[in-house]
Amino acid sequence: MVARQLLASGGAWLSLGGTQILLDPGPGSLVQATKRKLDPAKLDAIILSHRHLDHSGDINIMIEAMTDGGRKKRGVVFAPNDALDQDPVILSYLRSFPEKIEILTEGGSYKVNDVSFTTPIKHRHPVETYGFIFRTQHHTFSWVIDTKYFDKLPSYYEGELLIANVVMLNPKVAVDHLSLPEVKMIIEEIKPKIAILTHFGMNMWRARPWELARNLSEETGVSVIAARDGMKFDLARLEGVSPEASSGLARFE
Ligand SMILES: [Zn+2]
């Protein structure tokens, strides 16, 4: 999907009460962001869930863009340790450009302005990988990043909004990714107001994610949305009130 860019792989741009966070800048992140009038020079933080290229491909250029090529020391980069040690995806020469680099660990909590987030559990994935619970002044939402499904996985996440990386249509024992039936179990346990499916593999894509999402809505009673390139989701939808004074969440996967 990434190599052919059947879906864009630039990650997600979180705009939370004035705080700008880029999550998982995969290949094309810079192009997708500027195309959508999102200015990387305004980023407060870049978060990397894990070092795989579909999540990290553009992280170096986005660090450069956030810091005006290193001329302005600003912003924070969050990444697991193995994105920085041997065979690093974050180049050494630009590690002094951001204000700091913070290492993600299991059970960690972090802050960017008045947004906080936690990395509750190390995921089952070939490299060190974390999902996130984000808390703003008004909302809590979880993003379940790549992982093999495991017992109690849903119990680590919470919130009115659940975003899940659904790579596979059906579970495959040998692949460390979530499948649609597993994400259904997560939705049924967390019972968010809204769930967003994203990060589709080829079989998911061929099965028309928007139709799968509609079926899942009927089966679970939770409003399930299939993400699409450039989709913008306003967190005010969780309140059922006017979007004024609220934060928005745009994604460009
Ligand atoms: Zn991965």
Predicted regions and their residues:
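Short beta->alpha connector loops
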Residues: 27-28, 83, 123-126, 145-150
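Active-site neighborhood of phospho(di)ester-bond hydrolases with catalytic His/Asp-centered motifs
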Residues: 22-26, 43-50, 54, 79-80, ...
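Binuclear metal-ion centers of metallo-dependent hydrolases, dominated by the metallo-beta-lactamase
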Residues: 152-161, 169-253
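Conserved catalytic scaffold of divalent metal-dependent phosphoesterases
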Residues: 114-115, 136, 159-170
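Active-site metal-binding motif and surrounding structural segment of the metallo-beta-lactamase
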Residues: 28-78, 158-161
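Conserved beta-strand hairpin/beta-sheet module of binuclear metal-dependent hydrolase folds
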Residues: 1-36, 129-145, 161
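Metallo-beta-lactamase
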Residues: 72-129, 136-137, 230
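Metal-dependent catalytic neighborhoods of phosphoester/phosphodiester hydrolases
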Residues: 57-66, 89-91, 205-214
